[in-house]
Amino acid sequence: MSKRKAIPKKVRQSVYLMYNGHCAYCGTEIAYKDMQVDHATPLRIGGADDIPNYMPACRSCNHYKATLDIEGFRDYLSRLHKRLMRDSIPYQVAERFGIVKYVSDDVKFYFEELRGGENGTME
């Protein structure tokens, strides 16, 4: 397996500015030094290694998205509540006492909110 080439600084800066220093997925503000460049369509399923396929991501979103495409990541996130209710007693207790509140399985990413619900990456 070949090692991936580093993304040039100017390209990283362009990716960072796509969403004004926010994670394209969750919308969290991220410091430039902490931004990870994600491939919206993973390389392993034919995604390109270029700017139209890059998304600025926080460490957490990049970790959990891993090699999923955007719809796969959406599906993963939409199932989290059921999984937490099944597997996490502290989560169950927190929900019972109103500390956390279940809102919806409908996952809308930050980049979609900015673009009026349109799926896909910046072009």
Name each model-derived stretch.
Residues 6-14, 41-48:
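Short, intrinsically disordered, charge-biased short linear motifs at domain edges
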Residues 7-35, 58:
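Short cysteine-rich loop/turn motifs with clustered Cys
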Residues 35, 49, 68-71:
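Generic recognition of short, well-ordered alpha-helical segments
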Residues 36-40:
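Histidine-centered catalytic micro-motifs used for acid/base chemistry in nuclease
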Residues 34, 47, 113-115:
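Solvent-exposed, flexible loop/coil residues
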Residues 34, 44, 65-67:
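Activation segment
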